[in-house]
A protein has these predicted regions:
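Structural marker of alpha-solenoid helical repeat scaffolds
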Residues: 50, 84, 101, 117-118
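Structural signature of tandem alpha-helical TPR/SEL1-like repeats
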Residues: 34-42, 68-80, 102-114
Length: 132
């Protein structure tokens, strides 16, 4: 880890305390933003082991998988989020991007269109290509 890597689990904090989990989540966000998805995954794996129902942690882990080109793992994680939150437009859009990057255009188009239908923001609508 570099000197600029966010430190997880402050001294004196229990490895499984709620405070530690929040710090680890925020550190994972920072690592992903700093283009260190593998570092983010290390923090998120233990966080999700402690809180498997946390969809925000799972969504962040899916993004980290995508950023590190672990596309199958990313797709599985996005699908898990969508099982619990079928109206999550971002998860549909991100799953579509994952399918697109994996060379599965039919599956990608389906999720691009679902994302645009749930949240008609310009990026989602453009990707859905409704005119085709």
């Amino acid at each position: 880890m570099s000197d600029t890597t966010p430190q997880a689990s402050p001294p004196g904090a229990s490895p499984s305390s709620p405070e530690t989990h929040v710090i680890d989540f925020r550190a994972a966000e920072q690592l992903l933003a700093a283009r260190d998805p593998r570092g983010a995954l290390k923090l998120l794996d233990s966080l999700i082991a402690a809180h498997p129902e946390s969809m925000s942690a799972r969504l962040l882990r899916a993004r980290a998988f995508f950023a590190s080109a672990q596309l199958r793992s990313a797709a599985l994680e996005f699908e898990l989020v969508l099982e619990r939150e079928p109206d999550n437009a971002f998860a549909h859009f991100a799953l579509a991007r994952t399918h697109e990057r994996s060379g599965r255009p039919v599956q990608a188009r389906k999720h691009f269109r679902l994302a645009a239908a749930l949240d008609p923001q310009p990026d989602y609508v453009a990707a859905a290509r409704f005119e085709e």
